[in-house]
């Protein structure tokens, strides 16, 4: 098939799909850094935060934000409490740019901030915000119980 002919195109089976496959961290670096910055780990290394916005380069890569501009068009992950049926739950919502990247998003739960498990429950399918970014929502598996006040925590863990 001729991929330059729009008649041969079809909708992606994934929200944010990319016909070229996933973007590597090195490809992303070459888009956002210039010359010596690309090979300087103190500027473009995965754990560095050159724009001082609280997101290191790997998180910026995974979420699709710009590492040299601290005014992000994609909001930071947010925690909120919401009612689901008769119960109240802790939720996390995060947004990322479309396109495949070599990164995984794990929403993890903990009762002590030491031991983390992949037990969060995804709520519905991913959706798109008005800018075309992908929104994903998870909730803590157990409802918030006013009586026993067992602590519960959620975090977004981004890994390769």
Outline where the language-model segments fall.
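Extracytoplasmic/periplasmic, Sec-exported soluble proteins
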Residues: 46-51, 99
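Acidic, glycine/proline-rich Ca2+-coordinating loop motifs
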Residues: 24-27, 51, 64, 69, ...
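Glycine-aliphatic tripeptides that mark coil-to-beta-strand junctions in extracellular
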Residues: 50-58, 62
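Residue-level hotspots within well-ordered secondary structure
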Residues: 68-160
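Aromatic- and Gly/Pro-enriched helix-to-coil junctions and flexible linker segments
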Residues: 20-27, 58-61, 156
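Intrinsically disordered, low-complexity linkers and terminal tails enriched in Ser/Thr/Pro/Gly
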Residues: 1-46
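Acidic side chains
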Residues: 1-5, 49-53, 112, 142, ...
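Residue-level preference for well-ordered alpha-helical positions
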Residues: 29-33, 60, 108
């Amino acid at each position: 098939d001729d991929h330059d002919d729009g008649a041969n195109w079809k909708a992606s089976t994934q929200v944010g799909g990319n016909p070229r496959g996933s973007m590597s961290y090195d490809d992303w670096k070459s888009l956002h850094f210039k010359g010596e910055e690309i090979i300087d780990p103190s500027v473009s290394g995965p754990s560095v935060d050159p724009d001082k916005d609280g997101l290191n380069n790997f998180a910026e890569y995974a979420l699709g934000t710009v590492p040299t501009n601290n005014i992000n068009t994609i909001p930071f992950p947010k925690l909120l409490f919401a009612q689901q049926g008769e119960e109240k739950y802790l939720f996390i919502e995060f947004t990322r740019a479309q396109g495949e990247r070599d990164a995984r998003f794990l929403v993890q739960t903990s009762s002590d901030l030491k031991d983390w498990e992949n037990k969060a429950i995804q709520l519905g399918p991913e959706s798109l915000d008005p800018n075309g970014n992908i929104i994903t929502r998870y909730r803590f598996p157990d409802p918030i119980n006013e009586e026993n006040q067992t602590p519960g925590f959620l975090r977004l863990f981004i890994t390769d």
